[in-house]
């Protein structure tokens, strides 16, 4: 029996696995995609994320960097016509390579890693959870805890809550070409005509990346054409046809969708737990939540012991309380800047 089975090999799952494996716990990570896996993400690491990653995994290897590898921060172009700078040095990385590095470090520490294998079902029992895996490594295994780190539409959350998640769809394309924007910034746009949620443009190696977040998936292509036209007209974008595109789902943050850390022996972390900062910054909250879960388990049970679930959940919730409050404060700040997000002032 495993101490913990983790669904998803993103930042939340990998940091949990690394910390617990280092401490002698038996951990399995199941990732439905082959690795390295493509993941739609800005790949911008704020200083908080850099600090947590390097404390847990060691120096971030240059192989995961994109150019310009130093990012100066965010320029937020609001729906009121103002531009609000959020300055702060960040690292610009390829998310696929970052995740591959962290999951390999977790495996080297002793975690069992199954790629191309997904959690298809689970059954909670009195002292453990039976987990059904499907894919490359099909099996039925037992664990004292199941941790869902597989996103707002992931299997763990969907089965636990018995309903579809409430989420934002993201769509971004990668182009060759030129644009009159400072490549050292991540540019975000809140104008209503460009998206009913947000839009963005950034540079990574030889690519200009253009994306939108939308309330309804069917609107993604329509709004994406609008941001492309806007960039051509206002920033002299001269872009090739897209080399490739990516879609993803993110939790819709709001009073109706509070942070949700799971129930019973089923725990949630990262965006599966509705932890996400404005402008789709979710790596830091994923790392913090995975770290908090690992530390909570280490405080409540030794390797091979069954934890007191009530105490474990209490420790996990308390450890995240300041992070959740800070996250909500950031959304309230956005609500004060942008009428589009004004309802989030109720958080």
Locate predicted features.
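A short alpha-helix-loop-beta-strand transition element characteristic
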Residues: 35-37, 54-72, 164-167, 182, ...
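Glycine-rich FAD pyrophosphate-binding loop
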Residues: 7, 21-41
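A conserved beta-strand/loop capping segment in the N-terminal third of enzymes
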Residues: 46-49, 53-101
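C-terminal helical "tail/cap" subdomain of flavin- and related membrane-associated enzymes
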Residues: 298-347
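N-terminal Rossmann-fold NAD(P) dinucleotide-binding loop
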Residues: 13-14
């Amino acid at each position: 029996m495993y101490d913990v089975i983790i669904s998803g090999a993103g930042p939340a799952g990998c940091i949990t696995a690394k910390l617990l494996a280092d401490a002698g716990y038996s951990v399995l990570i199941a990732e439905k995609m082959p690795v390295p896996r493509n993941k739609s993400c800005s790949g911008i690491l704020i200083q908080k994320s850099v600090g947590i990653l390097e404390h847990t995994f060691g120096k971030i290897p240059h192989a995961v960097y994109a150019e310009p590898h130093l990012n100066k921060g965010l320029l937020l172009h609001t729906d009121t016509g103002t531009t609000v700078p959020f300055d702060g040095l960040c690292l610009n990385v390829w998310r696929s390579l970052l995740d591959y590095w962290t999951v390999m470090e977790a495996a080297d520490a002793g975690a069992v890693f199954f790629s191309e294998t997904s959690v298809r079902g689970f059954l909670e029992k009195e002292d453990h959870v039976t987990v059904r895996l499907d894919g490359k490594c099909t099996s039925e295994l037992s664990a004292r805890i199941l941790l869902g780190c597989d996103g707002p539409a992931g299997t763990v959350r969907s089965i636990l809550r018995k309903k579809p998640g409430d989420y934002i769809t993201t769509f971004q394309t990668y182009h060759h070409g030129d644009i009159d924007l400072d490549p050292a910034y991540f540019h975000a746009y809140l104008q209503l005509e460009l998206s009913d949620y947000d839009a963005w443009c950034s540079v990574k190696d030889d690519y200009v990346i253009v994306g939108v977040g939308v309330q309804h998936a069917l609107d993604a292509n329509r709004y994406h054409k609008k941001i492309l036209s806007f960039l051509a007209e206002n920033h002299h974008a001269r872009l090739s046809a897209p080399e490739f595109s990516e879609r993803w789902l993110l939790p819709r943050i709001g009073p109706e969708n509070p942070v949700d850390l799971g129930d019973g022996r089923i725990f949630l972390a990262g965006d599966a737990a509705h932890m996400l900062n404005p402008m789709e910054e979710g790596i830091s909250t994923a790392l913090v939540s995975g770290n908090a879960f690992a530390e909570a388990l280490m405080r409540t049970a030794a390797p091979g012991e069954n934890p007191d679930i009530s105490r474990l959940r209490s420790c996990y919730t308390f450890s995240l309380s300041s992070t959740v409050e800070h996250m909500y404060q950031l959304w309230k700040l956005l609500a004060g800047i942008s009428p589009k997000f004004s309802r989030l002032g109720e958080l």
